[in-house]
């Protein structure tokens, strides 16, 4: 049996799909989410085999959410929507399948069988996903979309992944690995990514370490492993 997460801003649509999947006897719904941010968090927490995802949702669309998933660990994604004009883009972005609302039981059964066959293969090849020009973050009971060009750096700690601009700090459900692959942020430390355009100066420290100072005055550590590469990116050879 496969595990599934349902992401749709319409509760009735989620409940109806959950009933259909339960009737199939092959899919266990382990969670539901009403928006993309909540959905991304539950994908990381629950690690479902498949996500049934609506496309048109507030703030962040289903297609945008797909581009935020780590291609090495992402579940299969089945879009469930009332609009057929997104089908081509969905498949170009590596969606597993595309179902139209109201969901036809026979069509859903075919999708479930394909999912079961795919799961048996256990062949999840890396996929190329679109780059991100903004980072979805949460804070103070709101969703914040931070443009990449405003981000100075991002780092991980016990609380999760934090994104720092000149004026504010916010928390993101995206991993540093995804941010490194999907944005212009570059690795400078095992726990830090930095926007090269935000660097004002680099202080060389002892033992081959360094510290970057951003235009806003924030300090960002640089490990020996990444110092040489960073200097080359900035034109120092």
From Swiss-Prot:
Residues in Response regulatory domain copies: 3-116
HTH LytTR-type domain: residues covered: 135-236
GO biological process, one term: regulation of DNA-templated transcription
InterPro entries for this protein: CheY-like_superfamily, LytR-like, LytTR_DNA-bd_dom, Sig_transdc_resp-reg_receiver
CDD domains: REC_LytTR_AlgR-like (cd17532)
A GO CC annotation given for this chain: cytosol
Keyword Heme annotated: no
Gene3D superfamilies: 3.40.50.2300, LytTr DNA-binding domain
UniProtKB keywords: DNA-binding, Phosphoprotein, Transcription, Transcription regulation, Two-component regulatory system
UniProt superkingdom: Bacteria
4-aspartylphosphate: modified positions: 54
UniProt-listed Pfam families: LytTR, Response_reg
SS bond partners: none
GO MF annotation, one: transcription cis-regulatory region binding
PANTHER family: STAGE 0 SPORULATION PROTEIN A HOMOLOG, TRANSCRIPTIONAL REGULATOR-RELATED
NCBIfam families: PRK11697.1
Protein name: Uncharacterized response regulatory protein VC_0693
